[in-house]
Each structure stands twice: as C-alpha cells, then as structure tokens.
C-alpha cells in the first residue's frame, strides 16, 4: 500500500487549521551483562530462547532480584536529563495478556518512577535550540520478540503462525516519557527527530546503551493529536509504535498530521488507537484500541521491595557522568575551529561521533569530515540507512586515509576500497589486495602511458607549448584510464611537465 491510497491534507493547510501536540515515549535497552530481574545474559544476537531462565519465563515460584547496575544506570540517565531522582521508587505489575509476555504481566514502574521532571535541550537544523520537558524516566523489563509467519505484512494480522523468542524478555529498559510538546507547528516532525537523535547521542555517551534504533535497543512510540488553532483542549491522540530510525520518526509525525487533519476536516473523529509505521511508504496503519492506565490494573509488585536511592549515592553517580554530548560539541567546535554552520552540518548528518572516532584513529578533522560528510553520507542516502549503520568503521576510514598519505592509494582508489568494505569483501587491506587497487609504482609503465597520451593529443601539446599550461587535464585523464586509475596523479603531472619542457 502506498500513501496514494490515503486521503491526506496538504501539510501547509494542516498548519493553517490545526496545532499539533506531540508526546514521545522512548524505550532504551540497557547494555547490562544480565537481565533486570534474573541472572540470564542480556546480550543481543544469541540463538532463540537460549538466554532464558525461570524468572524471565514466568515459571511458578521463580522470584525476581533487582539488577543493581540497572538501577545505577537508570539514575545516571535521569541525572543527564536534568531529572529529580526519587529517594524511594517502586516496581509495579502492568497486567496484560500477549504471547511475548510469559508472566502475563510486565514489571514496570507506575506512580513512583525512579526519575521525574527533567528536560533535554535539542539543536534543530538551523542551530536554534528547543527544550523538551521530560515527564518521567522509569525502569521496566522488556518483552519477548514475536516473529509472525505466513502473512504479507510481517505482523500478526494475516499470519498463519507466530514464533516466540524469550531472549529479550526481562532485558532492562528505561522508558523516557516527554510532557506534551506544544507550539511546534511546522517544526513538529523536525523537533521529534532532533529529540530522538539527541537522546541516542546521550545514552551512547553515558555508555549505558548502544542506542541502535535498527536493532531495537532504542524504540520510539510517537503520540500525536491535533486541535483547532486557538483551542486549549487537546485532541484525541494516536500512538505510532516501535519506530526504528530517525527518518521514520520524522515521516511518521508528518503523515499522522496530514491523515488526522483530513479526517477532522471531513467531519470524522480520531480513534484513540495504536498505529503501525510502514517503512516501505512512510505511512501508518491501524493497530488496536489504545488502553488507558486503568486497563492495565497496576499494583505494586509484592515480590520486589522499594528501590532506595540515598542522596549520597546519587551524588556519587553524578560524579561519574562523562562529558555530555552538548559539552563535547562545544569543545570540539573550539578545538577544530569550526563555524556554527560547519558544526550544524556535522550534527545534522549524525556524523560527529564517527568523525571524532576517526580522528582518534589517526586522521585530521578535515580528512575525517571529507569522508563521512560527503562520500559516506552519500552512500548512506543511496542505501536508505543511517550513517552509523553502514558496515564501515572509523578504523576503516583512518586506514584508507593512511594509505593515501603513504602514496599507496589515490582518492579514487580509496573510494573503491571503501566500496569493497561496504560490499562485505573484508577490511581495507584485504580489499586493496583482492581488487589490486594499490597505486602503480612502475615508472616505466607510467612513462609509456604518458608518451602514448602525448602522441595521441598533439593539439594539446601545441597549446601547452604556446603557454596554456592548464590544458593537461586530458593527458592526465588518458594516463589514468590506461592505468585503470592506479597511477599517482602527482607523478603523472611531473612527467608531463618534464616531457613538454
């Protein structure tokens, strides 16, 4: 199904009539060694149902024990988000039935979260800042993962069978919930994307999660409602679930604004429901009616005591906070002498961390920027993935730069080496060897190619000797073609100048 099958209002017309109100819920999987309430491994990628135990399977008599590292990291996230930390918080049971929830309830936090009343300032594409108010950040356990078979959508509707993998059940989660984001207008999609990007940078800097949207270690639920311009009361919201890329966050918000506006403008009503985001065409589809908190029948978990976080412990954790992303950006901008516009370009391309790591691997800032912001960003756009999801690491880029400096690769050959890494042909040195990319050092072969190119272009030789020294580009191009791009351009230019002197 494509967007053409939906009746949508033009985006500019939406803004003339309606005010969007957003609320974002971001689930962050913590990279602890073990699960939140048991000793099973929490590592991603194991064989299905191999990281399980009586607690995560909900077997009778199994009792949970709180992962202290998970609590510490939850406090660390709360502090970085400028939240107040509760001296005493409690776990609650969120009751619902679904095949990926073996216990038929999820251990979460309800009215006594670990962190509350915070904010995160995010940078927009033009360099302005927008403050996102944080309602709460609470601890909970993740669910299992369902794989639906036999349908066309990959979802449960239309499937003939579903497989359950409980490896993820019980993995520590922090759910970060914003307060309603009002007054964003046309920038609502951009603000949502910037917030998720900033939050991802934050949890990565804290070392508590890899923030991989594509692998599900960070998942976004986007709530959106519209209200007529000037109305105080919020409209009915929808919740688009499990959005897994920055681009998708922006597209999902945009689509829901246009879809809801068309429904309202034609006398319809918005159902309070979940929606599924469709990666293929940027649309959302109907899910299920959205429950209220009362439907989950929360009550304090009788198997778990309150979580006590004395002020002294909180301050000890605060002292361990690393340099936070916005502080690092300011430092890097000053050290690298970047303009505001240059820094915005790096942030907007989500390239800053990759560039910093490439510099740490041995390049200059300018060399690293040239690769990540131009060539590799282009490759990411062509394949429709985030820059960091490319199978190229800062170490790969640093190695290519080193080989270019050593004269073993040209820039063109370096790009071919990166293409090989992207294609899964191995690391840089393996690709250079297998593709035969190293610069030709046979002076005789290069000189012969220069002689042949000069003989084939007498008119250029005549113009050069008449004083127009800028015409040698065609000669250089012919030599590079003859050597399959493996000649050193500096050496070629030197030989041409010597022969035409």
From Swiss-Prot:
Keywords: ATP-binding, Ligase, Nucleotide-binding, Protein biosynthesis
Keyword rRNA-binding belongs to the record: no
Region: Disordered, residue numbers: 272-291
Disulfide bonds: none
NCBIfam families (UniProt xref): gatB, PRK05477.1-2, PRK05477.1-3, PRK05477.1-4
Family: Belongs to the GatB/GatE family. GatB subfamily.
Function: Allows the formation of correctly charged Asn-tRNA(Asn) or Gln-tRNA(Gln) through the transamidation of misacylated Asp-tRNA(Asn) or Glu-tRNA(Gln) in organisms which lack either or both of asparaginyl-tRNA or glutaminyl-tRNA synthetases. The reaction takes place in the presence of glutamine and ATP through an activated phospho-Asp-tRNA(Asn) or phospho-Glu-tRNA(Gln).
Subunit text: Heterotrimer of A, B and C subunits.
HAMAP family given in the database record: GatB (MF_00121)
Protein name (Swiss-Prot/TrEMBL): Aspartyl/glutamyl-tRNA(Asn/Gln) amidotransferase subunit B
Protein's organism: Corynebacterium efficiens (strain DSM 44549 / YS-314 / AJ 12310 / JCM 11189 / NBRC 100395)
Organism ancestry: Bacteria, Bacillati, Actinomycetota, Actinomycetes, Mycobacteriales
Gene label: gatB
